[in-house]
Curated annotation (Swiss-Prot):
Chain intervals for the UniProt region annotation (Required for nuclear import): 173-469
UniProt name for this protein: Nuclear receptor subfamily 4 group A member 1
Gene inactivation effect: Homozygous knockout mice display restenosis, the narrowing of blood vessels upon vascular injury. Mutant mice do not robustly raise blood glucose levels or increase the expression of genes involved in gluconeogenesis in response to injection of cytosporone B. They do not exhibit any increase in serum IL1B after administration of lipopolysaccharide (LPS). When challenged with LPS, mutant mice are partially resistant to endotoxic shock.
Gene Ontology biological process terms from the UniProt entry: apoptotic process; cell migration involved in sprouting angiogenesis; cellular response to corticotropin-releasing hormone stimulus; cellular response to fibroblast growth factor stimulus; cellular response to vascular endothelial growth factor stimulus; detection of lipopolysaccharide; endothelial cell chemotaxis; fat cell differentiation
Annotated stretches, region: Required for binding NBRE-containing DNA: 271-357
Role noted for this protein: Orphan nuclear receptor. Binds the NGFI-B response element (NBRE) 5'-AAAGGTCA-3'. Binds 9-cis-retinoic acid outside of its ligand-binding (NR LBD) domain. Participates in energy homeostasis by sequestrating the kinase STK11 in the nucleus, thereby attenuating cytoplasmic AMPK activation. Regulates the inflammatory response in macrophages by regulating metabolic adaptations during inflammation, including repressing the transcription of genes involved in the citric acid cycle (TCA). Inhibits NF-kappa-B signaling by binding to low-affinity NF-kappa-B binding sites, such as at the IL2 promoter. In the cytosol, upon its detection of both bacterial lipopolysaccharide (LPS) and NBRE-containing mitochondrial DNA released by GSDMD pores during pyroptosis, it promotes non-canonical NLRP3 inflammasome activation by stimulating association of NLRP3 and NEK7.
Protein induction: By serum growth factors and during liver regeneration.
Domain NR LBD: 363-598
Residues in the DNA-binding region annotation: 267-342
Region (Binds lipopolysaccharide): 524-547
């Protein structure tokens, strides 16, 4: 089959004008080609033709491979022009070469015109130098002609990638400028090599003429533009006897920038395994498989072991072989563990929330926090203390109490009961008890809690008593209503402050006073479980605050205040009994009920 090579690209700048060149089509037929190129030394009116190929290769009956040669002129060197031809017959018909033709076979610097038995330099160029054959001057070594100086080729870039021509047009244009003009008409439009089909019966190759018409205009490919091969040039792909290039012209020829953008790098690929990835997960573009693997590993705090050298390949096919190396690569590419939601924050779309195995405040830390919050919410703040009734100078306490003093005593007790009830409801686990046990625990521990909380808030050194409502009274102001009981409360307050009890420890101690075993409980087991949890919380806190050698002694001294507290509770019941006997003011129903319920014990 005949094979014609045509290469397109940005030609180098010509040193002279080229607007007089003609653009006649070039006819290609299946036969031996002759070249109707005039010699620079012949007369302009009668251009002579070049010798036929049969003259050069007389006696050779094989096939001609693709060749690339340079034609030197007599006045200036010519660059190489790219052509190709093949012959299927060994006919000896050849065109007659005039005597004035100055071309000899020795003057051709052959780059790729060898019989079929020789290895073609074109194949070597394609395999060694890549795109240099198509996009830049041929750099492969070639046989040299004696006494012939090759033209110096200046490097220039080809804009059409693999279809860029060699830079042999420059010398060819300069050489053809000396040819006579074929016509006096206007210059032809910019065109590439054009090959016209035969108009008649197919003659022999010796009868078909080969005419070269370089483009007069410079065609450059702008950045970001892409061109496809024109449909008017079918079969003009660079070919080789050993290569199949029938589908080259079917695909568009794009610029270097567009080709590099199409091949895309790693965009759209998983950074871990290279699979398809649509978006970013945990800070890195990953596939759904690696996203789920990373999330499960972080949520479960999974630990993996590599059975190899901790350098296992992680790709789409082998990503499940070593979980250790896969997780390490997830971290190496930048996936962030802190972004993964924990179990408590996981979305539960489409599912009913499962019942927790234990209450959310089951841990000692959460329980201690809840106890501290309940204690702070039930007490008055320092900014809201009421000093409106506070008096340091009062009459001596000798004499009998009046109704006003008794009423004040009852009001302080009943007011404290409401605050203590609200505080107890905020203790984790208390409201889960049955209502009967809740009331029993409150009524049994009411006086103890009243004394303990009053002693902790008061300032015994200044003689100030701070009640739960924020009311501040002096010790002498409470002497007639409370009697000797108030002196014992202040003494207990001094001993409690001497221990240096902090708020967390006091919050746990107050809860233990309320949550304890009482006679008549309906569900004592649940009360005991809640008591053990609070005791463990207090023990852990004391161990943290006091240190290793001190926690046992500090805890025992703190719990040693509970018997003193029960003694003070008994004294308070006795005071209520005395005031009830005097019958100056009837006691409130809740106080009377508490008193009557404790008499039987």
């Amino acid at each position: 089959m005949p094979c014609i090579q045509a290469q397109y690209g940005t030609p180098a700048t010509s040193p002279g004008p080229r607007d007089h060149l003609t653009g006649d089509p070039l006819a290609l037929e299946f036969g031996k080609p002759t070249m109707d190129l005039a010699s620079p030394e012949t007369a302009p009116a009668a251009p002579a033709t070049l010798p036929s190929f049969s003259t050069f290769m007389d006696g050779y009956t094989g096939e001609f491979d693709t060749f690339l040669y340079q034609l030197p002129g007599t006045t200036q060197p010519c660059s190489s022009a790219c052509s190709s031809a093949s012959s299927t017959s060994s006919s000896s018909s050849s065109a007659t070469s005039p005597a004035s033709a100055s071309f000899k076979f020795e003057d051709f610097q052959v780059y790729g015109c060898y019989p079929g038995t020789l290895s073609g330099p074109l194949d070597e160029t394609l395999s060694s130098s890549g795109s240099e054959y198509y996009g830049s001057p041929c750099s492969a070594p070639s046989p040299s002609t004696p006494n012939f100086q090759p033209s110096q080729l200046s490097p220039w870039d080809g804009s059409f990638g693999h279809f860029s021509p060699s830079q042999t047009y420059e010398g060819l244009w300069a050489w053809t400028e000396q040819l006579p003009k074929a016509s006096s008409g206007p210059p032809p439009p910019p065109t590439f090599f054009s090959f016209s089909p035969p108009t008649g019966p197919s003659p022999s190759l010796a009868q078909s003429s080969l005419k070269l018409f370089p483009p007069p205009a410079t065609h450059q490919l702008g950045e970001g533009e892409s061109y496809s091969m024109p449909a008017a040039f079918p079969g003009l792909a660079p070919t080789s006897p050993n290569r199949d290039t029938s589908g080259i012209l079917d695909a568009p020829v794009t610029s270097t920038k567009s080709r590099s953008g199409a091949s895309g790098g790693s965009e759209g690929r998983c950074a871990v395994c290279g699979d398809n990835a649509s978006c970013q997960h945990y800070g890195v573009r990953t596939c759904e498989g690696c996203k789920g693997f990373f999330k499960r590993t972080v949520q479960k705090s999974a630990k993996y072991i590599c059975l190899a050298n901790k350098d296992c390949p992680v790709d789409k096919r082998r990503r499940n072989r070593c979980q250790f190396c896969r997780f390490q690569k997830c971290l190496a590419v930048g996936m962030v563990k802190e972004v993964v939601r924990t179990d408590s924050l996981k979305g539960r779309r489409g599912r009913l929330p499962s019942k927790p195995k234990q209450p959310p405040d089951a841990s000692p830390t959460n329980l201690l926090t809840s106890l501290i919050r309940a204690h702070l919410d039930s007490g008055p703040s320092t900014a809201k203390l009421d000093y409106s009734k506070f008096q340091e100078l009062v009459l001596p306490r000798f004499g009998k109490e009046d109704a006003g003093d008794v009423q004040q005593f009852y009001d302080l007790l009943s007011g404290s009961l409401d605050v203590i009830r609200k505080w107890a409801e905020k203790i984790p686990g208390f409201i889960e008890l049955c209502p009967g046990d809740q009331d029993l625990l409150l009524e049994s521990a009411f006086l103890e809690l009243f004394i303990l909380r009053l002693a902790y808030r008061s300032k015994p050194g200044e003689g100030k008593l701070i009640f739960c409502s924020g009311l501040v009274l002096h010790q002498l102001q409470c002497a007639r209503g409370f009697g000797d009981w108030i002196d014992n409360i202040l003494a207990f307050s001094r001993s409690l402050h001497s221990l240096g009890v902090d708020v967390p420890a006091f919050a746990c101690l107050s809860a233990l006073v309320l949550i304890t075993d009482r006679h008549g409980l309906q569900d004592p087991r649940r009360v005991e479980e809640l008591q053990n949890r609070i005791a463990s919380c207090l023990k852990e806190h004391m161990a943290t605050v006091a240190g290793d050698p001190q926690p046992a002694s500090c805890l025992s001294r703190l719990l040693g205040k509970l018997p003193e507290l029960r003694t003070l509770c008994t004294q308070g019941l006795q005071r209520i009994f005395c005031l009830k006997l005097e019958d100056l003011v009837p006691p409130p129903p809740i106080v009377d009920k508490i008193f009557m319920d404790t008499l039987s014990f």
